[in-house]
């Protein structure tokens, strides 16, 4: 039986985001707390879920239960969040659920705010380390930062650099796999396809089908899905 969760009125207030773990930009806001309050009330219901953890790209995936009927899922995406925000809320929003898997996508808001690729990649490493320490042997999927904008430029190189650093930091870790959600979407010049990213940042429903189909074989390889071909 699950031990009762810590009695409290709600999630830990964010305080000064500059004091959060990690390096690089950090912020909270009204939406941050408005999302975290329901997360708190859903803690018992979501025990043992596979948790999707990230920013608005994750928050917008509102059909996880339908798209992954084999799994109990929990969406812990917050629009506008950065990697330091995920470090701050890792315990209460994810680890307290005793999750059976993690699907992590974060970093575009960091890069858009001037973060260095090394900051983002090392914050992601800290998220993975924190999850692994609390949940030994539980599978982790780290998604590549997706393409952004219609014109290639410095931002394209920073995304590619960050993804390469993530690959290097995750290499050889047991039960940790990369999901190439950059390569699955990017046009040859590294930009976002407008048919799947109408605002050139967030995937639409058709884009989420591609994301699901890119995740599925990785989840199958990790034993999270029993059949990688038929969700």
Residue ranges of predicted features:
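Solvent-exposed, acidic/flexible segments
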Residues: 50, 79, 83, 87, ...
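Catalytic His-Asp segment of secreted/periplasmic serine-dependent ester chemistry enzymes
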Residues: 147-231
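Charged, glycine-enriched surface loops/patches
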Residues: 121-143, 161-176
């Amino acid at each position: 039986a699950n031990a009762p969760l810590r009695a409290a009125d709600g999630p830990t207030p964010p305080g000064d985001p500059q004091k959060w773990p990690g390096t690089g930009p950090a912020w909270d806001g009204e939406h941050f707390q408005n999302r975290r309050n329901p997360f708190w009330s859903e803690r018992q219901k979501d025990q043992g879920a596979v948790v999707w953890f990230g920013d608005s790209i994750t928050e917008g995936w509102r059909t996880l239960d339908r798209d992954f009927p084999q799994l109990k899922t929990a969406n812990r995406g917050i629009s506008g969040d950065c990697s330091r925000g995920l470090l701050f809320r890792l315990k209460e929003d994810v680890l307290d659920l005793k999750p059976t898997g993690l699907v992590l996508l974060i970093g575009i808001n960091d890069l858009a705010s001037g973060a260095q690729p090394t900051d983002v990649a090392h914050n992601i490493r800290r998220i993975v380390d924190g999850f692994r320490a609390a949940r030994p042997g539980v599978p982790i999927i780290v998604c590549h930062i997706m393409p952004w904008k219609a014109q290639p430029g410095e931002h394209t190189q920073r995304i590619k650099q960050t993804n390469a650093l993530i690959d290097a930091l995750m290499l050889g870790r047991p039960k940790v796999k990369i999901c190439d959600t950059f390569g699955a979407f990017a046009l040859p010049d590294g930009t976002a396809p407008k048919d799947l990213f109408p605002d050139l940042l967030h995937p639409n429903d058709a884009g989420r089908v591609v994301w699901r189909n890119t995740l599925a074989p990785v989840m199958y390889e990790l034993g999270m899905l029993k059949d990688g071909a038929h969700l």
